[in-house]
């Protein structure tokens, strides 16, 4: 069976999913493209990782009859729920249609959150980004929040590295720009009242995230927790990569210094799409 123009795959909302079959699934995207697609993203859903696509082939066609392999991926693993895998296309062309052939690693039903195509090569200028090492630690493994976090994030190292680059992409033009040399991110899940906090300066950054806040955020849904966790992480990672104002005191002694630091972090969080505008305070 072939599915055509599945609306849930192009709405930019990974909570609305394509649910396929246990074997190879074929999905055709037929909006009659006029400009070559240069990269695409596949998103995991909120379902268990066993339902994620693990291998896929993207094909292009000029007439809907003859198909050419455009990109092929095997042994793929999503680092979290609602997570993208970005795939550049090596030899783009004026294909009018695309077909995705995908399947899971085992014999489980395939579920995909989104498939989004771009007329830009979204990897350009960032291939040489220097990813920091990650030291991930759970100080309160017995808490409900720690267990919920594990349901959301399957590979914390890759998850944190992904967000480090996303922050840099907003703050800078290319990976070759001068930026703070963040070599290691120490990320800790901790049982305390609060949300999150960053300490230290490059090359070593320390971020803690409250398991109690995780529990609270997950009360509504796993997607709400995902939204909050990414938003908080964007904010804290900006503090790792942003430059500080000069000649106006310090974070604790000058309100303009504080406003610059925190305002930039919130601005990047908003730009990334993970800022709940309904919670804004005047």
Residue positions per predicted region:
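Zinc-dependent metallopeptidase catalytic helix centered on the HExxH motif
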Residues: 190-277
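Acidic/histidine-rich, surface-exposed loop or edge segments in extracytoplasmic proteins
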Residues: 128-154, 211
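Extracellular/periplasmic catalytic domains that process cell-envelope and extracellular macromolecules
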Residues: 91-94, 128-130, 178-181, 198-203, ...
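Aromatic, loop-rich ligand-recognition surfaces of beta-strand-rich domains
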Residues: 3-71, 81-123
């Amino acid at each position: 069976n072939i599915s055509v123009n599945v609306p849930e795959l192009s709405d930019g909302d990974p909570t609305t999913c394509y649910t396929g079959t246990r074997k190879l699934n074929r999905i055709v995207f037929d909006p009659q493209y006029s400009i070559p697609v240069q990269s695409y993203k596949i998103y995991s859903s909120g379902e268990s990782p066993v339902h994620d696509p693990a291998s896929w082939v993207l094909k292009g066609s000029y007439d809907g009859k003859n198909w050419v392999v455009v990109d092929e991926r095997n042994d793929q693993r999503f680092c979290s729920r609602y997570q993208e895998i970005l795939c550049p296309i090596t030899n783009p062309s004026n294909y009018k249609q695309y077909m995705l052939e995908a399947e899971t690693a085992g014999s489980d039903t395939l579920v995909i959150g989104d498939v989004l195509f771009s007329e830009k090569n979204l990897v350009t200028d960032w291939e040489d980004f220097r990813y920091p090492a990650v030291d991930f630690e759970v100080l309160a493994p017995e808490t409900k929040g720690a267990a919920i976090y594990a349901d959301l994030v399957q590979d914390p190292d890759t998850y944190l590295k992904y967000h480090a680059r996303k922050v840099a992409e907003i703050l800078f033009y290319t990976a070759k720009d001068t930026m703070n040399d963040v070599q290691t991110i120490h990320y800790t899940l901790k049982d305390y009242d609060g949300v999150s906090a960053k300490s230290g300066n490059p090359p070593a950054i320390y971020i803690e995230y409250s398991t109690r806040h995780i529990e609270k955020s997950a009360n509504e849904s796993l997607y709400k927790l995902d939204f909050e966790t990414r938003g908080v992480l964007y904010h804290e990672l900006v503090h790792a990569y942003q430059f500080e104002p000069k000649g106006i005191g310090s974070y604790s002694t000058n309100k303009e210094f504080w406003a610059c630091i925190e305002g930039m972090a919130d601005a990047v969080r908003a730009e990334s799409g993970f800022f709940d505008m309904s919670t804004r305070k005047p």
